């Protein structure tokens, strides 16, 4: 089927942690290796993903600190995808161990050509661990609390801080009007995310693989400063689901072209399209079947070197990739 569809590269393992490690410390990589072997025999290359985008239930139950805390300081339940704390030492260690093992077992496979780090990084955590890292980040940036107060204009509304320990991240239950606080928090979230990516890449290198790495960025996402990703990614990739065949097509064309240009400009080099859909998706009210070749023309004329579809297999399949 893949050959008939002219598919020469696939991404695997993206949301597969619960299958790769069904119980703590008990790993099952055989099925993944078999898939990569079979693809390679058919002349199809593999982009191997790290599974940190969705953690298994046993981890959330045993180590609740891996779950995010919302702005109102309540801990989330298990579920969803981006529901993990980028600061949690437990989560970072678990991710490190998994990534290193994948690198050791599969990083030198001749069919593997690229590492896909996690999936669609985004969101933020307001737990005590992240709060403390935020205070350390502020202290490193400003040096003294006096300089922070001056830069943030905290005299307004009598919001002067006496020490960095008094500072809390923005919250609907507390400080949520101080623009400088919100801006620095967003900058901190980007730096925290990048630091997490660096940890994943380091684990892969420890496992022996020197293959390039990418991370699939998201359309028009303003929660992270993508320009800062240029130093941690070898190649930029992103996910694009344009809604073609509306009344005014040129808006969609212009928007898609602009997004392609933004992704290409992050590293000033060709990019990859990691996700797209030729027909309908289950999260858009309207997403018509595209005319043959139209996305291909838009994509490659803007500098892409890869077009991948998501998702080709049912989520009930092993690994859910």
Where are these regions (language model features)?
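Short, well-ordered coil/turn segments that N-cap beta-strands
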Residues: 6-8, 40-46, 108-113, 208-212, ...
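Short, solvent-exposed turn/loop segments enriched in Gly/Ser/Thr/Pro and often Arg
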Residues: 11-16, 49-58, 113-122, 217-222, ...
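Polysaccharide-binding and catalytic clefts of secreted carbohydrate-active enzymes
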Residues: 72, 76-235, 239-256
């Amino acid at each position: 089927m893949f050959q008939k569809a002219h598919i020469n590269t696939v991404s695997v393992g993206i949301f597969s942690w619960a299958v790769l490690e069904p119980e703590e410390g008990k790993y099952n990589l055989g099925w993944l290796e078999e898939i990569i072997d079979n693809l390679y025999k058919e002349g199809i290359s593999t982009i191997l993903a790290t599974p940190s985008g969705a953690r298994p239930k046993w981890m959330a139950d045993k180590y609740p600190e891996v779950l995010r805390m919302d702005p109102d300081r309540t801990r989330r339940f298990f579920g969803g995808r981006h529901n993990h704390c980028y600061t949690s030492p437990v989560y970072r260690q678990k991710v490190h161990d998994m990534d290193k093992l994948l690198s050791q077992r599969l990083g030198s496979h001749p069919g593997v050509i690229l590492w896909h780090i996690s999936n669609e990084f985004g969101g933020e955590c307001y737990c005590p661990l992240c709060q403390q890292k935020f205070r350390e980040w502020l202290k490193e940036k400003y040096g003294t609390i006096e300089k922070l107060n001056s830069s943030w204009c905290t005299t307004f509304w009598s919001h002067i801080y006496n020490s960095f320990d008094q500072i809390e991240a923005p919250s609907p239950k507390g400080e949520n009007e101080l623009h400088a606080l919100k801006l620095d928090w967003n900058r901190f979230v980007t730096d925290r995310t990048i630091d997490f990516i660096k940890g994943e890449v380091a684990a892969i290198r420890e496992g022996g693989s020197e293959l390039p790495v990418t991370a699939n960025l998201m359309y028009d996402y303003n929660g992270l400063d993508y320009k800062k990703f240029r130093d941690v990614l070898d190649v930029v990739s992103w996910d694009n689901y344009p809604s073609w065949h509306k009344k005014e097509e040129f808006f969609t064309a212009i928007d898609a072209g602009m997004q392609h240009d933004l992704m290409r400009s992050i590293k000033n080099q060709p990019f990859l399209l990691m996700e797209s859909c030729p027909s309908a998706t289950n999260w858009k009210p309207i997403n018509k079947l595209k005319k043959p070749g139209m996305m291909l023309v838009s994509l490659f004329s803007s500098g892409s070197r890869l077009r991948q579809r998501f998702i080709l297999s049912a989520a009930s399949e092993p690994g859910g990739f």
